[in-house]
Amino acid sequence: LGIDKIKTAVGGSCGGYQVLEWLLMEPNAIENYTICVTSPKESAWGIAVHTAHRTAIELDPTWKKNIEDAGLNGMKGARQIGLLFYRNHEIYHQHQNEDNNEKIKDFKSTSYLKYQGEKLAKRFSPISYYKLTEVLDTHNIARGRDKEIKDTLKRIQQKGLVVSISSDLLCPPTEQQFMARHLPNAQYGLIDSLYGH
């Protein structure tokens, strides 16, 4: 394409992982960066969430069978687990709370989670979702570079913006604050939002 330089690389969540790696691997290719709700290393919390996702898929009796939609219901369950971490108590309370005190089934939260599972099933295969979570678990910018992640962050000299979302449970602001402290030319910003990751 004849592109020699990228003015600004932008990535959120695992897209932020890619931007960080690119900044380290090709330091002269990118002038600036903006990374949102991301981290320099997959957290123990993130790995635990991904493990629950994979377990849901593995518990689907069709998983690893030689059929087109093997593990599909397990992946839907995995997505439902994910939505507990991508959102939070307050946002569920605001949007899925029941007004009918007599209701004992067909809850809004149930419907919402099932809808999200179905929606994901239209754009992801269970094997790709499973493998994606495995790859995310391996993210660590210090691997093969430094003993300490903060030393690897110091290698990134480009000007940058590191952004958090106040209610993010999956990749909380402490992750981005750590990066902003150790990235030499980074500014930090916090978005106050109830919508989580």
Name every feature range the model reports, one short phrase each.
Residues 1-3:
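Well-ordered mid-protein domain cores that form the structural environment of catalytic cofactors
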Residues 5-46:
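Conserved hydrolase catalytic core segment
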Residues 29-31, 35-119:
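Alpha/beta-hydrolase-fold enzymes
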Residues 39, 166-168:
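Residue-level signal for short, function-critical loop segments
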Residues 115-116, 131-152:
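Active-site nucleophile elbow and catalytic-triad environment of alpha/beta-hydrolase enzymes
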Residues 173-196:
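Catalytic histidine neighborhood in serine/cysteine hydrolases
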